[in-house]
Amino acid sequence: MHAVIPQVTIHDIEAAESYLREQIVPGVSQAPGFVTAYFARKENSGLGMIIFDSEDAARAMSERIASMVPGTVTLDSVEVREVVANS
C-alpha cells in the first residue's frame, strides 16, 4: 500500500471543512485503488493521509490533488510514501 499525504494551509476553516466533507471525501473514495483516508487539522494547518492499494494508484491521485483544492486553502505539499505498517 501507498499513502498520498497532502499538507495545506487553511484560510477559511468552516468553508474548507465543508468542501472537504462534500467534495474531497466523496471524490477520493471513488478513485481506483482507494483503501481509506484520514484528514486532520491543527489550527490553520491541514494534513491528509489517503491510502491506495498500489504505488501507481497513489501517484495518479497525487497528480490530481492540486486540481481538487478549493480557494479556501493553499496546497503546501503532496508526498507519496510507502505504508510500512498498519493496525
Regions found by a protein language model. Give the residues of each.
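Short S/T/G/P-rich N-terminal loop/turn motif that feeds into the first structured element of a domain
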Residues: 1-47, 53-87
